[in-house]
């Protein structure tokens, strides 16, 4: 069996199958809703590209790491390596912005949301997911309390 990866960089290895399947579900749900010009923030291993990109007129991805060589072979997909925020795109550029299991790792999360709003076309949509930090199935125990510095796990007013 392969090594157990964290949800930080999901792989298709058998030992990581639950996390992979759970993460892939977001891409399938988004694929039913998106169209036009799409930006993905936090492409990671890129497993969602083959699900979502065929539904987009243009598909641009941004990740802090360079894409794996096999990902760059996808036609009609443009890769950008950058730390966000900011987003290096013109205002009103995208019909949809998607970002799955990423925002909890962005220190300037409020600024990122402002940037997403800026690059979305009028009427555009931001589809975002973040893990439930009390999820006992999360493969990295520290992440259950480390997401958003543990504040997400605390009840309001605690």
Locate predicted features.
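Conserved N-terminal segment of class I S-adenosyl-L-methionine
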Residues: 1-90, 96-100, 110-113, 146
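Active-site micro-motifs of SAM-dependent methyltransferase domains
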Residues: 86, 104, 135
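Residues lining the SAM
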Residues: 100-103, 129
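Di-metal (Zn2+ and/or Mg2+/Mn2+) metal-binding site signature of metallo-dependent hydrolases
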Residues: 105-109
């Amino acid at each position: 069996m392969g090594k157990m990866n964290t949800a930080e960089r999901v792989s298709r290895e058998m030992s990581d199958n639950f996390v992979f399947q759970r993460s892939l579900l977001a891409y399938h749900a988004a694929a039913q809703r998106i169209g036009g010009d799409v930006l993905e923030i936090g492409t990671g291993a890129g497993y969602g590209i083959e699900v979502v990109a065929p539904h987009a007129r243009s598909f641009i991805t941004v990740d802090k790491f360079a894409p794996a060589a096999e990902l760059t072979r996808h036609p009609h997909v443009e890769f950008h390596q950058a730390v966000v925020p900011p987003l290096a795109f013109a205002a009103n550029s995208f019909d949809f912005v998607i970002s799955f299991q990423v925002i909890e790792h962005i220190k300037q999360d409020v600024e990122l949301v402002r940037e997403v709003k800026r690059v979305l076309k009028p009427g555009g949509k931001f589809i975002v997911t973040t893990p439930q930090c009390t999820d006992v199935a999360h493969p990295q125990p520290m992440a259950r309390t480390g997401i958003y510095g543990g504040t997400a796990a605390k009840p309001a007013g605690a």
